[in-house]
Amino acid sequence: KNISNKYIEKNNLRGLVDAKKYSLQYNSSDIITFLDDDIILMPTYLQNICLAFQNNFQIKGANGLILNKSKQNIFKKTLFNLTHIGLYKDDRGKTIKTIDKDKPIQVNTLSGGISSWRREIFNNTQFDNKNFFHFMEDVEFSIRFKKKYKAGAYLIPNAELLHYHIESNAENKKKQILMHVKECFMIFKKNRRFSILGLDLTLILLYYLIYSIYFSFKNKNIKYLFSFLIGMTRGINIKIK
């Protein structure tokens, strides 16, 4: 089949979330795919994504399988799982020891930069381009998506790709800590009635406190901890639109 590319330039878009929302008006397909610019798709990636949607109408949103995903040690994995519950539960990083390449696997959170969606889900689940989520945009959108489609998110194992994340430098790491902490509060404020009495917020903040202390000692720089405290202050004071 013929493939055509349309390049759209709009200079006043405020980040990836705004760009995604803006791009929807140009779509004419039943399946919409968003891709980061640091990935390489295997030759059959899009074909297998489309087949999965065709064969299982329960699939409303999907990710492919990242082949070069870095492995976490047991301590980091355990700490992550213990501190990411309730609103912040995220099973994208779970290890799949035995995998059936032809069987989609249900997950609770999708990565936005390697995601595919049925067009109709955007009729009632829109991207939030008012609150400027960035590092936790995936989690924020997945929470609202799950409210409409409880069992609609899947990993498609035979849709394979490589994802080359750029290693963060010190300044980016500090910004990540600050923004993650702030956006944890933002997610809580948007969805507090679905929270586990605030325990989920408390635990994920503990995770980032440990994270910031670790990098402060590792790099002998207290500014990582300061980033956590600034994120706390901004998160407490921020108002959700």
Model-assigned labels for residue ranges:
Residues K10-N27:
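Glycine-rich, basic loop-to-helix element that forms the pyrophosphate-binding segment
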Residues K174-C184, K189, F194-K241:
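Non-catalytic, C-terminal membrane-associated alpha-helical segments of glycosyltransferases
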Residues L110, H134-F141:
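Acidic donor-binding loop at a coil-to-helix junction in glycosyltransferase catalytic cores
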Residues T44-T78:
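Conserved donor NDP-sugar-binding/catalytic core segment of glycosyltransferases
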Residues K1-E9:
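Acidic donor-binding segment of Leloir-type glycosyltransferases
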Residues L82-V107:
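Short, flexible, basic/aromatic active-site loop/helix in glycosyltransferases
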Residues N129-K130, Y154-K173, E183-I187:
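Active-site donor/metal-binding and catalytic loop motifs
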Residues I32:
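Short aromatic/hydrophobic "clamp" motif used to bind/position activated sugar donors
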